[in-house]
A protein has these predicted regions:
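Rossmann-like dinucleotide/phosphate-binding beta-alpha-beta segment
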Residues: 15-17, 137-209
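Rossmann-fold NAD(P) dinucleotide-binding segment
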Residues: 59-71, 85-88
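N-terminal glycine-/charge-rich "phosphate-binding" loop or analogous flexible N-terminal tail
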Residues: 1-50
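An anion/phosphate-binding loop that grips the pyrophosphate of nucleotide cofactors and donors
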Residues: 50, 68, 198-199
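Rossmann-fold NAD(P)-binding glycine/threonine-rich loop
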Residues: 82-94
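Short beta->alpha connector loops at strand-helix junctions that form conserved
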Residues: 33, 77-78, 94-105, 174, ...
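Phosphate-binding beta-alpha-beta segment of Rossmann-like dinucleotide-binding domains, i.e.
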Residues: 92-94, 100-146, 150, 154, ...
Length: 209
């Protein structure tokens, strides 16, 4: 089985355990050598003779799907599949899989690391220290502040849990909010505009569309 692998973190030389697992499954792997998501015209020549497709953030349009008669399955390396023309895949009988929640812990932790970096001005202070300066800056204390989480899915929930550990007040907006979960974890439900007005920190975990 020939498989196209396009996610940039799954390319040779990246030390990915997932790639080693994939190599054990197939010895005919095709890789993305451009180091970025592929366009339609870049994708078709690589994909047209493949049976499987482990997809990154490429543009998987009807044009791409129609050009690939050997394709039997598309598996998104991530939770979202908004870049896949689901209707076109369904019309050709090609199942589309994704991996919801697989990176939630890592992304949620990174989100909070970035919040700390901004609140405590870590990048600026690091640069100034390297330049021989000694800038005194207290930054912003997070305890008691309100974090507004837009999108309370798997990643948003990890971010909320981290924020609770810092004794922050957590509010959330989600068009498909789980009221029972929010009640259980003391998360205030807000409308979009209310969250923007009330939050000291905003974490965005929704598609930009």
């Amino acid at each position: 089985m020939r498989i196209l692998v396009t996610p940039t973190s799954l390319q040779p030389g990246k030390g990915s355990k997932a790639l080693e697992t994939l190599k054990a499954f197939s010895d005919d792997l095709v890789f993305n050598e451009l180091g970025r998501p592929l366009t339609e015209d870049e994708l078709i020549p690589l994909l047209k003779d493949c049976d499987g497709y482990v997809a990154g953030l490429d543009s998987i349009t009807q044009k791409v799907i129609d050009a690939c008669d050997h394709l039997k399955v598309i598996s998104r390396y991530g939770a979202g599949y908004d870049r896949v023309d689901i209707a076109a895949a369904k019309a050709k009988g090609i199942p589309v899989a994704n991996t919801p929640g697989v990176n939630a812990e890592a992304v949620g932790e990174l989100t909070f690391a970035l919040i700390l970096a901004v609140a405590r001005r870590i990048p600026y202070l690091n640069d100034s220290t390297r330049n021989g300066e000694w800038v005194r800056s207290t930054g912003m204390e997070l305890k008691g502040k309100t974090i507004g989480i837009m999108g309370l899915g798997a990643i948003g929930k990890v971010t909320a849990r981290c924020a609770k550990g810092f004794e922050m007040n957590v509010i959330a907006y989600d068009p498909f909010i789980n009221e029972a979960y929010c009640a259980e974890h003391d998360i205030g439900i807000r409308a979009f505009d209310e969250l923007v007005q009330q939050a000291d920190v905003i974490a965005l975990h929704l598609p930009l569309m």
